[in-house]
Structure formats: C-alpha cells, structure tokens
C-alpha cells in the first residue's frame, strides 16, 4: 500500500499510542519526521526519540511522556497542510495555537521550526501541524 501522507501517518501513530498510554512507538524514518520529533522533544511533548539504522530507511522510536498521575502531556495533534490542500502562511500571519499554549510546526526555508521560532526569524512557510 502506498502511503500518500507520511506526516499524517506519523501524527496518527503518536495520537493512537498516546490514547492507549503506550510507552513508545516506532515509525519509518525520514528527515522531516526526525525534525518534527526534535521539536516535540524540545517543547516537552515527548520524552525522547532515537533513530535506529537498518539496511533500508531506518526507524524512529518515539518515547511518549506522561504526567505524575499518568495523565497525557499531548492533548491533541492536528494535521493542517495536507497533500490535497497545502496551507502556507506569510511571516506576519504565523498562527498561535490555543493562544500560545500549543505549538504550530512550520516548514520554512530555514528548516522545520515552531510558530514562535518562525515569528522570531520573520519566516513564513507551510503549516504542517498543531500540537497542544
């Protein structure tokens, strides 16, 4: 089966594993998934991730993060720009997610960054996803 939207698949796997409180999950590796994983780790939404090299494309193992009473750190994930309908924003139109409580992941010419970093660098780009 051909995967038409690997980013949506990645976010869905995280959402599903989070809903059933799995400790970790594995996804096929790609550069953009590594960049998204790095942002999620840096912003405190996941505990860690590791890239496992194999003879093919590799695997990313994501370790999910939960609170003291096993409450979820990730409340929601939403794919914004889709293959059939891309969503681009200018530097002055970068969205805020839940008035700053969440993050927007944006693919810019400077790489994949959060909404806050995009505003600081005055860079627009493709809005990949919202995480809150």
From Swiss-Prot:
UniProt keyword terms in alphabetical order: Ribonucleoprotein, Ribosomal protein, RNA-binding, rRNA-binding
Pfam families to which the protein is assigned, alphabetical: Ribosomal_S8 (PF00410)
Residues making up the signal peptide according to the UniProt record: none
Paired cysteines (S-S): none
Domain of life (superkingdom): Bacteria
GO process terms (BP): translation
UniProt-listed Gene3D superfamilies: 3.30.1370.30, 3.30.1490.10
SUPFAM superfamilies named in the record: Ribosomal protein S8 (SSF56047)
Record-linked InterPro entries: Ribosomal_uS8, Ribosomal_uS8_CS, Ribosomal_uS8_sf
GO molecular function, one term: rRNA binding
Record field: transmembrane: none
Record GO cellular component, one term: ribosome
Function: One of the primary rRNA binding proteins, it binds directly to 16S rRNA central domain where it helps coordinate assembly of the platform of the 30S subunit.
Similarity remark: Belongs to the universal ribosomal protein uS8 family.
Quaternary structure, from the entry: Part of the 30S ribosomal subunit. Contacts proteins S5 and S12.
Protein name per the record: Small ribosomal subunit protein uS8
Name of the gene this protein is made from: rpsH
